[in-house]
Amino acid sequence: MTEERKKILAAVTERAENFVKGFDLEFAAGYMKKREEAEAEELLIRAGELMDQTFVFADKWDMEPCREPYTLTEMEWQRTPNGDPEWIFMLNRHDYLHKLMMAYYLTGNEAYTDKLKWYLFHWMCHNPILPEGSDSTRTIDTGIRCMNWEDLILHLAGNGMLTQ
């Protein structure tokens, strides 16, 4: 990594650390465990599925719900296991990745954030920017993904979990 990139990373990390300091994460995790026990348990179940690359799109605000779980043994961002292109769009929005960050906050288990980073970097490496676009880079889904990534990257960097 060049010196200039190191400086940029250090500046981003510092800002992210200040962002994360604005949250009382210990209180929030404790509150969820104590007062929203069923929701915390469900979140950990969904995060566990994501550890195995199993996807269920059944959250309250999912635009294209799919309650059927699908496991992608090999991560393919452009393939739909059920023949519905809307499934690809849901996969590439990355809303579900917040479950891994929350599971880390609830348990302290860095395996969740390791898998979260794996998803982010795998997506970056397997989805080049093409002039003609692709099913994984539609404009609306790219906007949603960017909003999700912004929050996730702030939390990862703010917790000292990003080094590149």
Regions found by a protein language model. Name each.
Residues D84-Q164:
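Aromatic-lined, polymer-binding surfaces characteristic
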